[in-house]
Regions:
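C-terminal membrane-anchoring or membrane-association module
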Residues: 247-255
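Residues within well-ordered beta-strands of beta-sheet-rich folds
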Residues: 135-139, 209-211
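Short, threonine-centered small-residue motifs that mark membrane-proximal processing/anchoring sites
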Residues: 1-27, 218-248
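N-terminal targeting leaders for non-cytosolic proteins
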Residues: 26-119
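Terminal, low-complexity interaction segments
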Residues: 159-229
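Short proline/glycine-enriched turn/loop motifs at strand-loop junctions of beta-rich domains
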Residues: 131, 142-144
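Short, surface-exposed beta-strand/strand-loop-strand elements in extracellular ectodomains
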Residues: 145-156
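Extended extracellular/luminal ectodomain segments enriched in beta-structured repeat modules
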Residues: 128-135
Length: 255
């Protein structure tokens, strides 16, 4: 009976779309608008993304950043994370950024506003979003860096650590030339969901912790939240039910 119940529950959740958030990073198509597709120095606005057969345009943006650690910048190519923008784009540029600077760079839909990291720079940043979200869209200029991601949970703990390698990401369809580089570089994209981060109950999610180490080759990134599975509160209920069903299945196998 328990096995039958588990199968029925998973089938029901799949029919409602709640199980769409499987433990696997996903690809997506980026729909954007810009006036400069030659030099890629101007504003590049994110309009929507396509995941499978669905289009999403209701995003959750970063509204607060807590700097746990960020290598100090004093001159030149020292330091780690900084606020950066396209040469002709609007937005913040700050070599020695405050938490508010970083939140401003990430907290909008201008893909020309990014966090730029020096090649050997180290940082630990905690990011918080405007509204609950179950998935995250990462963009990395250059497609040659790594970034460690963890979920921050309401009880003060963290989810599992996920190391992203942008050299394996798909191309996002645009390039980016910012004030610190001479020519435009292609941008890669990848989607990550809460299951990827070891979170089975979305109600526990509080924020993201991003980490760069000295051998990660300085990720230059943007991250935007989006609800892919189903809107809240069904997402919370769905993820909780899936987690309970999986636990029940494991207990059955152990008996």
């Amino acid at each position: 009976m328990k096995t039958k119940l588990f199968t029925t529950l998973i089938s029901t959740l799949a029919l409602t779309g709640i199980c769409a958030t499987s433990a696997q990073a996903f690809t997506f198509k980026t729909n954007f608008s810009t006036t400069d597709t030659t030099n890629w120095k101007s504003d590049i606005f994110l309009n929507s993304v396509e995941i499978g057969s669905k289009t999403y345009s209701d995003f959750s943006l970063v509204n607060n950043v807590n700097i746990i650690q960020n290598d100090l910048w004093t001159k030149g190519n020292e330091g780690a994370a900084s606020s950066e923008r396209g040469d002709n784009a609007s937005g913040v540029k700050a070599e020695n950024p405050t938490a508010s600077n970083l939140a401003a760079s990430l907290g909008n839909l201008n893909l020309s506003n990014i966090v730029d990291t020096e090649d050997k720079g180290k940082f630990t940043l905690d990011l918080f979003f405007t509204k609950p979200t179950d998935s995250f869209l990462f963009f990395e200029r250059g497609r040659n860096s790594k970034l460690q991601v963890q979920a921050l949970l309401a009880d003060g703990s963290t989810g599992k650590s996920l190391l992203l390698d942008s050299s394996k990401w798909q191309q996002a369809g645009y390039s980016l030339n910012t004030t610190e580089i001479a020519t435009a570089q292609k941008v890669g994209s990848l989607g990550v969901n809460l299951f990827d981060l070891g979170v089975e109950d979305a109600s526990l999610f509080k924020g993201l912790r991003l980490v760069s180490q000295s051998n990660y080759v300085g990720p230059d990134f943007k991250v935007v939240g989006v609800n892919v599975a189903v809107p809240e509160p069904a997402t919370v209920l769905g993820l909780g039910l899936v987690g309970a069903a999986l636990a029940m299945s494991r207990r059955k196998k152990a008996q």
